[in-house]
Swiss-Prot record:
It is found in: Nucleus. Residues 58-91 are annotated as: Disordered. One of its GO terms (biological process) is transcription by RNA polymerase II. GO terms for molecular function: TBP-class protein binding. Residues 69-78 have a biased composition (Basic residues). This is Moonshiner. Part of a rhi-dependent transcription machinery that enables the generation of piRNA precursors from heterochromatin while maintaining the suppression of transposon-encoded promoters and enhancers. Moonshiner/CG12721 recruits transcriptional machinery to heterochromatin to initiate the bidirectional transcription of piRNA clusters. Functions by forming a complex with transcription initiation factors TfIIA-S and Trf2, and interacting with del which is part of the RDC (rhi, del and cuff) complex that binds to repressive H3K9me3 marks in the chromatin. It comes from the Eukaryota. GO terms for cellular component: heterochromatin; transcription factor TFIIA complex. Transmembrane segments: none annotated. Disruption phenotype: Viable and ovaries appear normal. However females are sterile. Phenotype likely results from transcriptional defects at piRNA clusters caused by loss of Pol II specifically at rhi-dependent piRNA clusters in the developing ovary, resulting in a severe reduction in steady-state piRNA precursor levels and derepression of transposable mRNA transcription. The name 'Moonshiner' derives from its activity in the transcriptional 'prohibition' of heterochromatin.
Amino acid sequence: MAKILPTDGIWIPESCSFPEDVMIDMMEGLFRDVPNLTHKEYLALADLQSRWMAKLANRQPESNPLPPKPKKRKKIAPKKQDQPVEEKGSEVDIYDVDDNEMVNNRIYIPRLRSAWRARYFNIMMRAFVIKRGLLNKHINWQILDKIMAAPDAEGQAELQAFVDKVVAGQEM
C-alpha cells in the first residue's frame, strides 16, 4: 500500500466530506438493519446521529479559500533632477550678427557622469566662435571635469577663461 503524503494543511473538498458520508451511510444502515425499533429508540438514534454530525463538523479542517490576490506593485517614479531656472534674455540669431560682435552664449552641460548635475553657463564670446564651432574642437573631458567639479560661479569663471584662451589662440 502506498504511503499517504502529508498535505501540509491543504485539503481537497471531497476529503472533507468523506467522514460525513461514512456517518450518514452507517446511520442509514442502522435504521434499516435493526428491526423492531421503538419510537423512543428511533428518536435516540436520530439524536445520536445529530450529535455525531455536530462533533464531526467541529473537527473538520478549515476549508482553504483561494489565496489572496497579490498586491499591485507600486511604481516608484524616478526622481527628477531640479533643472536650473531658465532666465529669459534677449535671443538673437547668431548668423544675423557680425563675426566680431560679443554675444552671450548659454551653454548647457548635461549630467554625463554620476557625480555631476545638469548646469547652464552664460559665457560672453565673439559670434565667430559659435559660428565656426571652435569650442567643440577644443573641449575635452579634463576641462569638463574641472568645470563641473567647481561651484557655479567658479565653474562659470573657469569656462569663461577657457573660452577666452581659445578665442585668443584663434585670433593670432
